[in-house]
Amino acid sequence: MTAREGSVGGTPLPRGTALLREPLLNKGTAFSAAERDALGLRGLLPPRINTQADQVSRVLENFRRKPTDLDKYINLAALHDRNETLFYRVVVDNPDEMMPIIYTPTVGQACQQFGHIFQRPRGLFVSIEDLGRVEAVLRNWPHRDVAMIVVTDGERILGLGDQGADGMGIPVGKLSLYTA
């Protein structure tokens, strides 16, 4: 079995809907027939198998139909939450179109609307209530192989003033650019 079909580094992959909810591993409709069988995905996805290029084309078509930059930001955030590989392929292949959406200027508006557009947690929130427990909070991060972090206190986000936890869009956006 390939890494996608059974395990990564000896760790078994999640199966079925658990795999489809894991953005680091989910390939959406790009899972092959063999992968669908091995990973319990048959019947959980539309039967047609798409290439990543097909998926990119569909993402761009949907993205370009969005009426506002904030709608485009929400669309890309949802993709990021579903399929990170596809998200980064779209960003890398279309930087001029994507960068102003995932970072400035749109990320400022996204931070201001964070409480209204929040869909899935990204990042690690450390607050004053965590005083004396920061190490325990850091241990809650699910990934051990961390190559880079971006930290903000939420103050003076893009000249917008103190955004507090709503400023999380800044480190998420920066890491998206650095990763791409």
What are these regions (language model features)?
Residues T2-A180:
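Metallocofactor- and cofactor-centric catalytic cores in central/energy metabolism, strongly enriched
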